[in-house]
Amino acid sequence: SCLREGSDIDRIAEVIQNVPGRPLVVVSALWGMTDRLFRAAREPQYAGRLVNDLKSQHLLFAPGLDTGEFSELFKKVISGISNELVNLSSGEYSLRSENLILAAGERLSALAVAHRLRSIGLDANPIGAEDIGLKLKGKGRASEIDISASSEKLEREKLIGIPILTGWFGEGEDGDIAILSRGGSDHSAAAFANLMNASKLILWKDVDGIKRLNPRWGIETPAIDYLGYGQASELALHGTPVIHPATVSPLIEPGIPLEIRNIKNPTTDAPTVIGPDFDLDSIVAIGCQPGVSVITQEGPLNSDLLSR
């Protein structure tokens, strides 16, 4: 997440105020929040301290959230985290309880962003993705969003004003909450772009686009100015940490362009734009997939293994 401090929400406000047309905003949890929620779900003994820390951190981002227009929703989410942590601390693991705890990060983020935007006069409205019919493929944990089912069920009339939507989770095939893999808010944003016939999707990150080499390798390379959908998917699958691997799939059929922008430099041109595949022959980047091993078995040329 690029939501590290309150000033990042101010940058979001600046973007919204200057964007043409009607924006729809999809948020992830505040920076570091999902890791802490994962730990609390797996180690409930940290529950009491975590809940207090969550409340304090979000109030630093959005002062007055606990007394403002969304105060009841804020208290409900905080209380929900406490209740689910109590359930887990009883010793009986529940994927549903864990999912509800994890999804609270996005819910709190949407409330904090909406509250802060409202404080400067923007008509921002926090909305839970599963509350308006976003359907996921899977139960509990899902690989991707079901665009076809979501298109039929999505309650678009609830997207009023400037919607601040939760990323990363939705409604699973069993009607209960389901979450995507880590970084799935990118995919959520792309799905909403598809479902709302958006002219463009912008992913705001804390990096300058997708680089030719993974910056974690310690070699500085320039950003790739243009990537095809297929190229972007391949890089996401092979070690490029900027976007979720499923991000571009909802964008391909409608041909929606995707821009990767740096929230720290909102007025500069997009370092990387993703769109239709044009040039499939040139090498644009190098990626790798860690944790993969090759096993080679050697034997005489007349070995029976060769005929199997």
Segments predicted by a language model, with ranges:
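Acidic-aromatic/histidine active-site loop/patch
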Residues: 251
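Nucleotide/pyrophosphate-binding catalytic subdomain
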Residues: 1-243, 248
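Binding-interface segments
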Residues: 258
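Short beta-strand-to-turn element immediately C-terminal to the catalytic PLP-Schiff-base lysine
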Residues: 40, 261, 274-275
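Self-splicing inteins and homing endonuclease
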Residues: 134-142, 265-282
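A conserved regulatory-domain signal marking ACT and ACT-like small-molecule sensing domains
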Residues: 271-308
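Acidic carboxylate-rich catalytic motifs and surrounding loops in phosphoryl-/glycosyl-chemistry enzymes
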Residues: 130, 261-265
